[in-house]
Amino acid sequence: MAWYHQHRWHLDYSIPRQNLQAFLTTITFIDPQFKIQENGLTEGEYKTQIVKQIIPQLCRIPNQNSPPPIWVQGPRIKGDPTWLKINAKFITELIPKQKGTKNISTKTYLSRLFVIWLQN
């Protein structure tokens, strides 16, 4: 799935939100910094909640090799706020514009999201 640095780009390119959410769920690795079992959540439940909160913030991640992390408020757990530190990893692909020429273009893909989940 190509990365377009534009707000709501998945709508502009006719990617249904369910497909975007499924894609992000597969490439997202979540590292909770507290015990999840005490809060009564399964991995599937909290991963779905977190991906839903990340989607509107995707346009804040700069499209570059080592973008700085962004911070997003996470889901509330037992009334307490949590924070998500999101690090993105991109892959840039070189694509020839025409066969037999040296003209190339690049296409950047979002390949991985690493989320550190912190509780206050």
Curated annotation (Swiss-Prot):
Q: List the subcellular locations.
A: Host mitochondrion
Q: Chief location of this protein?
A: host cell
- Which keywords describe this protein according to UniProt? Apoptosis, Host mitochondrion
Q: Which GO CC annotations does the UniProt entry carry?
A: host cell mitochondrion
Q: State the protein's purpose.
A: Induces alteration of mitochondrial function that results in apoptosis contributing to tumor regression.
Q: Tell me what this protein is called.
A: Protein ORF-C
Q: What species was this sequence derived from?
A: Walleye dermal sarcoma virus
Q: Which gene encodes it?
A: orfC
